[in-house]
Amino acid sequence: MNEVGSMAIGEPLIKEVGHHDQYQVVDLDLPLPKVAARFAERPDDVLLVYNRDEDKFHGSFYLYDFHLAYGNPPKKWKNSIHKATIVDVMNTNIATIEWTANISQAWGLVTTKRPSAILLKDEKGRFAGYLSNKDLWTALEQLDENPALIGA
């Protein structure tokens, strides 16, 4: 968990921008052929890898990662990538931020930690969604177009 710093008054909060629904939560043992089926239905989603027993997210996986895994599989799976599960090839560098943080704080998290995915939590610490790159970038562009939001 990353602490968020001081907030610019009037700057949009993360929960106020984007949809936070461009993801699917999947189990650790999801086989890659089933990953392919999920991406066939919703190619723009990120798959968030979750362990129900631990109540913990362990990683993320994008369509781009899927292509990399099949095109250049890890040594262990060189001749049998179709038998691998998502946990074998997922990105483990994920970060969490409160959805009451502002856009600048989210951007600070991106530039310092470079996570593969940013998970959102609500005021009670529960999972509240996912902040997509597109939503963050759109919000940053809006701030650039209207700098008065930062000091409002």
Positions of predicted regions on the chain:
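The conserved cystathionine-beta-synthase
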Residues: 25-44, 50-51, 95-115, 120-123, ...
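Acidic/polar N-terminal loop/beta-strand segments that form early-domain functional surfaces
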Residues: 49-52, 63
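Tandem CBS (Bateman) regulatory domains
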Residues: 1-22, 62-95, 102-112, 127-152
